[in-house]
Amino acid sequence: MPIATPEVYNEMLDRAKAGKFAYPAINVTSSQTLHAALRGFAEAESDGIVQISTGGAEFLGGQHNKDMVTGAVALAEFAHIVAEKYDVTVALHTDHCPKDKLDGYVRPLIAVSEERVKAGRNPLFQSHMWDGSAETLADNLSIAQELLARARAARIILEVEITPTGGEEDGVSHEINDSLYTTVDDAVRTVEALGLGEKGRYLLAASFGNVHGVYKPGNVVLRPELLKELNEGIASKYGQPAGSKPFDFVFHGGSGSTAEEIATALENGVVKMNIDTDTQYAFTRPVVDHMFRNYDGVLKVDGEVGNKKTYDPRTWGKLAEAGMAARVVEACGHLRSAGQKIK
């Protein structure tokens, strides 16, 4: 299927909220990990989101130049072509972008889509993330207002993170403490600045104890029920009916989450869940297994010539793709998006 148009992307998000499921947002760093994500979505019969972080884009730009925009645009254009061969609909997104990288990443990418839209085409990416969690909320929302206005004109959705997610993601790090919980006051200030859709659609990465990276169960206290409090607080203040879900929430830092925590988040308006750490492991684990099992073929040991079939990147690359795709299928099951593809 083609990459989602702006209209289809909005439909995807509306369907997720109404159906109480969420789309896995899979970080990719190469054409191979892109295919793994697309394959996983197709096998699960789930639509989904593929995203590129600043670090991923830099890697894609090549180690000689490390140009983030070049890397992101190149993989996005590639995705627009290869996605046609998969019977699911996928949206393209850029992940965490802090203030010091806006001018080298998100702003130029919005400009690319602005030019495409002026020419009567669809935007290259369907959404971009502004991560202002390291800034004061006032500065965060001020920049978000500027980006939201540009995104709306380019038919793009903006994702904002208003309070910190713990751990580290591509150089953006926060301590694990009480600041990891968004308050109703934070939500009110967000709506005052960004509106409730009339200024452009945005996704909200609210914090309810989330932590990026790897952690053991019990080390982090997630409170997904907090999302209900945020929705209720805004619905009450703005005269919306009881049970309204004014926000499109994003779940960051979900590695190690329990099924119950994920279910509670879905019930309260989460429509997108970022997955990176787990799929990185799922991609790499089969490669390690292959290398250990074929050590004397992969390396030229004791004067031998090795075995080309074992060190051919396609041999172990196929295993990596299959491993990551299987983890994407698992994620679709956890998030209830499996079998929910747009017909």
Swiss-Prot record:
It is an enzyme of class 4 (lyase). GO terms for cellular component: cytosol. Keywords: Glycolysis, Lyase, Metal-binding, Zinc. Its cofactor is Zn(2+). InterPro entries: Aldolase_TIM, FBA_II, Fruct_bisP_bact. One of its GO terms (molecular function) is fructose-bisphosphate aldolase activity. GO terms for biological process: glycolytic process. It catalyses: beta-D-fructose 1,6-bisphosphate = D-glyceraldehyde 3-phosphate + dihydroxyacetone phosphate. Zn(2+) 2 binds at residues 131, 161. It comes from the Bacteria. Binds 2 Zn(2+) ions per subunit. One is catalytic and the other provides a structural contribution. Its EC number is 4.1.2.13. The active site is at residue 95. Zn(2+) 1 binds at residues 96, 212, 252. Dihydroxyacetone phosphate binds at residues 213, 253-255, 274-277. Pfam families: F_bP_aldolase. D-glyceraldehyde 3-phosphate binds at residue 53. Pathway: Carbohydrate degradation; glycolysis; D-glyceraldehyde 3-phosphate and glycerone phosphate from D-glucose: step 4/4. Catalyzes the aldol condensation of dihydroxyacetone phosphate (DHAP or glycerone-phosphate) with glyceraldehyde 3-phosphate (G3P) to form fructose 1,6-bisphosphate (FBP) in gluconeogenesis and the reverse reaction in glycolysis. Belongs to the class II fructose-bisphosphate aldolase family. This is Fructose-bisphosphate aldolase. It comes from Streptomyces coelicolor (strain ATCC BAA-471 / A3(2) / M145).
